[in-house]
Curated annotation (Swiss-Prot):
Protein name, per record: Phosphoglucosamine mutase
Catalytic activity, reaction form: alpha-D-glucosamine 1-phosphate = D-glucosamine 6-phosphate
Entry similarity comment: Belongs to the phosphohexose mutase family.
Biological processes, Gene Ontology terms: carbohydrate metabolic process; peptidoglycan biosynthetic process; UDP-N-acetylglucosamine biosynthetic process
Keyword Isomerase in record: yes
């Protein structure tokens, strides 16, 4: 059954436009609370709510609290905290569920609601459908004796900081390193600099003055120019950029070179292989560069691809029992450290890996150079049989590129467009292949 409200990462949209309105979020909290009460019959459920720094977070948090307590669910509120911190505390405090109010890397004018089940894992499709079935029903507030309570908890930041530090090797530290840490004026502004400082690094903080409106604005993992300039200005060893909710990571070296999620995953995997740690393999996505796949296999590390989206990477990791995965966008999963993507913990794993390899980022990543890619968006008509029209040319191009390139065709889920991506060892091979396939699709 198709979901009506939940997308791939919870409920998200523009603030003030359905579904990110206080009245809908009230119903969402009430519906989720009803499901929790039905599932947790032994005692009154407790939910943890965290948020990023968007001005709309106050409004949406109040609506959620009202919905949950009306359904008979207790609520604890942390204030601003990264998404992976909410997941961790949901597990560590043995709570019934966790909720993060954030729209991740989007502008302040957007917001969203993301749920975690008991144990800090993302909700299953079945539970999301169960919640959706109750959203449109009538709200019947519990009798006063069964209403939930809400309270703010102190020390959530400190507990998450200690957890992050515990993922770094106990026999080592970060003394001697100068780091610029860009927290995107987002959820990590209060915790990320402290983690690296307490492990011994000299920390320069930027993107750490949120005002409700400047989250992700020319800063953070989706805009690294500010970090690159700061690293050069302060003559730092590395720059670390998180996104608005703290689950993505980009890094910059002392020369201002940017390293995306693929490069950082390779560094972690190579170090684990060098240490003889069995990670099983690495899960990327259909968009992961083929050159990285080849480089990993040269290190003796297996590789497979999932659909685009960190939830699909996580599914593959769980199914295969592998430990490392992620995307070029900076979502990195280290399953032996945390059960969700965590920008701070991922940065610590990269820094630990560089110590293990006794090399800097540029040297390790020189093992492979991304294959050139050509991407073409082809507009199509509704109902156009583009797969049939392009299948012969697609087969020809794939045969020509066998072992030295690949093709990815993806229909957009939001607009009438087919995205053609061809990557190959040589740029002209990629360009020619993409143009041939795009022409065969036809478009409008």
């Amino acid at each position: 059954m198709a979901k009506k409200y939940f997308g791939t990462d919870g409920v998200r949209g523009e603030v003030g436009q359905f579904p990110i309105t206080p009245d809908f979020v009230l119903k969402l909290g009430y519906a989720a609370g009803q499901v929790l009460v039905q599932h947790d019959t032994d005692q009154k459920p407790t939910v943890l709510i965290g948020k990023d720094t968007r001005i709309s977070g106050y409004m949406l948090e109040a609506a959620l609290v009202a919905g949950f307590t009306a359904a008979g669910v207790n609520v604890v509120q942390t204030g601003p905290l990264p998404t992976p911190g909410v997941a961790y505390l949901t597990r560590a405090l043995r709570l019934s569920a966790g909720v993060m109010i954030s729209a991740s890397h989007n502008a302040y004018s957007d917001n969203g609601i993301k749920f975690f089940a008991e144990g800090g894992v993302k909700l299953s499709d079945e539970v999301e459908l169960e919640i959706e079935a109750k959203i449109d029903g009538e709200m019947k507030t519990q009798p006063s004796a069964r209403l939930g309570r809400a309270r703010r908890i102190s020390g959530a930041d400190d507990r998450y900081i200690e957890f992050c530090k515990s993922t770094f090797p106990s026999h080592s530290d970060l003394r001697g390193l100068k780091l610029v840490v860009d927290t995107a004026n987002g959820a990590g502004y209060g915790v990320a600099p402290k983690v690296f400082h307490e492990l011994g690094a000299q920390v320069v903080s930027i993107g750490n003055e949120p005002n409700g409106y400047n989250i992700n604005e020319k800063c953070g993992a989706t805009y690294t120019k500010t970090l690159q300039a700061a690293v050069l200005q302060h003559e730092a060893d590395y720059g670390i950029a998180l996104d608005g909710d703290g689950d993505r990571l980009m890094m910059v070296d002392k020369n201002g070179q940017v390293y995306d999620g693929d490069s950082l995953i390779y560094v972690i995997a190579k170090a684990r292989a060098r240490e003889g740690i069995n990670i099983g393999g690495v899960v990327g996505t259909v968009m992961t560069n083929m050159a990285m796949e080849i480089a990993l296999k040269e290190q003796g590390v297996d590789f497979c691809r999932a659909k685009v989206g960190d939830r699909y990477v996580l599914e593959q990791l769980n199914q295969r029992g592998w430990l490392i995965g992620g995307e070029a966008s900076g979502h990195i999963l280290c399953m032996d450290k945390h059960n969700t993507g965590d920008g701070i913990i991922s940065a610590l794993q990269v820094l630990a890996a560089l110590q293990t390899l006794n090399q800097d980022l540029a040297t390790v990543c020189a093992d492979w150079q991304p294959y050139p890619q050509t991407m073409i968006n082809v507009r199509i008509q509704k109902g156009q049989q583009w797969q049939e029209a392009s299948k012969d040319v697609l087969a020809e191009v794939e045969k020509e590129l066998e072992g030295k390139g690949r093709v990815v065709l993806r229909a957009s889920g939001t607009e009438p467009v087919v995205r053609v991506m061809v990557e190959a060892r040589q740029a002209d091979w990629a360009r020619e292949g993409a143009e041939r396939i795009a022409a065969a699709i036809g478009g409008i």
